[in-house]
Structures are given as C-alpha cells and as structure tokens.
Amino acid sequence: MSAVSTCADGLVLRLYIQPKASRDSIVGLHGDELKVAITAPPVDGQANAHLTKYLAKQFRVAKSQVIIEKGELGRHKQVKILNPQNIPTEVAALTE
C-alpha cells in the first residue's frame, strides 16, 4: 500500500508523525509513509488533536472529516480525509 491512496469517499493517508517540530509541515516521503511534522508534544492526545486540526486546514475540510483510523497511540498512523476540497501539492504528487 502506498502513502496516499484514494477511496470512494476521499483519501487514505499513511503517515509518520514527528511531534515537537519547529513548525507544522508535510515533509515528504519517509519510507512508504508520508512524514508530517507538528509542533504539539505527544502528551494526552495533544498531537492527535493538533494533527487533525492541521490536516483539516490543509485539505479545507471540517475537523470531523479527518478520521484517525489506525495508530491513535503511535507515530505511524492511517488517516482518512473525507471529501477533500483541496489537496496539498506534496500529497497530490503521491496520489495513485
């Protein structure tokens, strides 16, 4: 499975998260996953909440349309974006 794949109702992203980064950004490929750096620390779900907010802003969707399907407690996550209004260039280059 690739880092970015399309499904009937949106996109599925396989992510590697780097918490406590200096700024929020989509870094690029990290093995077979998409690396995303976020400023939030990995404490009490802060990183997941921040990741959801950041991805919602990048894809121009509501936070409720960003679903963490797998990896709630780890750095390796699978996230589904429902009906994205915008696809960042880093992600568009990786779509199948």
From Swiss-Prot:
Pfam families in alphabetical order: DUF167
GO CC, any one term: cytoplasm
SMART domains from the UniProt entry: DUF167 (SM01152)
Top-level taxon: Bacteria
InterPro entries membership: DUF167, YggU-like_sf
Family note: Belongs to the UPF0235 family.
Protein name as catalogued: UPF0235 protein Ent638_3359
